[in-house]
Amino acid sequence: MKKIIEQAADRAVAEYLDRPYILSRELAIFSDHQSKGDFYPNIPFENVVGLEKRNEFKDCVTIRDTAYRLHCEGWDERKTEVLAYFNSPLRDNEFPVTGSRKPLTMHAIGDAAYCFLGNHRLPAMFVYNAYSSNFDEVLKEVKCTKYGVNESLFEILTLVSKGEGRLYYYHVDSYDKFILLETGLRWTLYRNKRSLGQSDKEDFYFHKVCSGFFEWSQKIAFCLFSPVPKSSYKELPQRISRLFLGDSLLNDAEE
């Protein structure tokens, strides 16, 4: 199976395989952390924007990179079942390999989905289905926990989705995060810092730290308020900001 997945990764042609993905824990920055429950939507591969990196994936940037690193241990013995799983309704079905006891589980903010459980099988599914002409490029009826957009970031994401601003983020840890919004010459720095145990929606809100104009004032602000320089922040692609604001996955989903 490892050779089959590597061959698929070599030959598959799909733009989403070569887009840099975002770490799932970083995408959670943009969530309201208020679960709307578990649903079973059909999620197009195009809508999957994040994985959680394991140690063996630490140098990987894209889905294709990650597929090459898979060990596929125990997959050969269940090859027929594994390939059938890739193109079947997933729901609460376990991956048919010894040691994999839980269903593939996604989280979604709006229409932007990211992997919560199944970070090995998902890249394999992506490259194999993209390579195989008779397989669909969609996660069929996949278990998915749905969240809304962090209300304090809604207006910011709307600006970015329209191309009227650029958003950068820095994830210190689960309790300390930063957002930088640039609109022309103006910049605004936001921070969310909460204490252990806080879990209300408002506890995840971002609050303005400072704002100004021109790069020189931004550098001063970063020295005073940010733990790292701007070069350590990551930019959120406009495409993902648009997905955050969508709602088609929820409309298409069955509880």
Task: Give residue spans per PLM region.
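Short alpha-helix boundary/capping and kink motifs at helix termini
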Residues: M1-A112
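A short, basic-hydrophobic beta/loop patch
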Residues: V97-L159
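Generic hydrophobic, helix-prone segments enriched in Leu/Val/Ile
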Residues: V48-V49, T66-E81, N129, K140-T145, ...
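Sequence-level detector for tyrosine residue identity
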Residues: Y16, Y21, Y40, Y68, ...
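C-terminal interaction module
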Residues: E164-E255
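Charged/polar, low-hydrophobicity segments characteristic of intrinsically disordered regions
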Residues: K2-Q7, I156-G163
